[in-house]
Amino acid sequence: MSEEKLSGAELVVRSLEYMNISTIFGLPGGAILPAYDPLYDSPIRHILARHEQGSGHMAEGYAQATGELGVVIATSGPGATNLITPLTNALMDSTPLLAITGQVASEAIGNDAFQEAYTVGLTMAATKHNYLITSAEEIPQVLLEAKHIATTGRPGPVLVDIPKDILNQKVEWIEPKLIEMPGYKPTLEPNPKMISQAA
């Protein structure tokens, strides 16, 4: 018998629970609204901000104070662009941060839809890595990879952009696999040659 199907929004919350995330920061808005419904039944504490930039800085401060991954959630367009300053700050301060942003429906991307912004492009210089989800099935694995990238090597921010239709898409939960990212190998040991040159 197959498992019950979950919406992409439910997968977001279930994935955060799977990753032992206890606290997230954010501000609801149209494109990310579906992700707020499953939070009612979740043990994850949501701290409501009055502005996305503030929620991003709160998540960053939380990560710095606790040593845990900071998580911030925002809507599309201006909601996502308001995260650029906290993302850049987290990048400069080596703070592990996961930003989850809503996006207009997949078929509307690139058509100047209401509150559409090219979030992945806008945040490339402000993050270690970013993702645009194209299927709800990707959500658990991508969020686990995002956490891995944000917390390993030199810590920093990772953004996951999720179109609204993907948040509403129903699929089965697929438990994330072990992280295997052949192209991502953070340097953990200092280079002795570079240390000698600096001295």
Residue ranges of model-derived segments:
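N-terminal alpha/beta PP-like core and its mobile active-site loop of ThDP/TPP-dependent enzymes
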Residues: 1-199
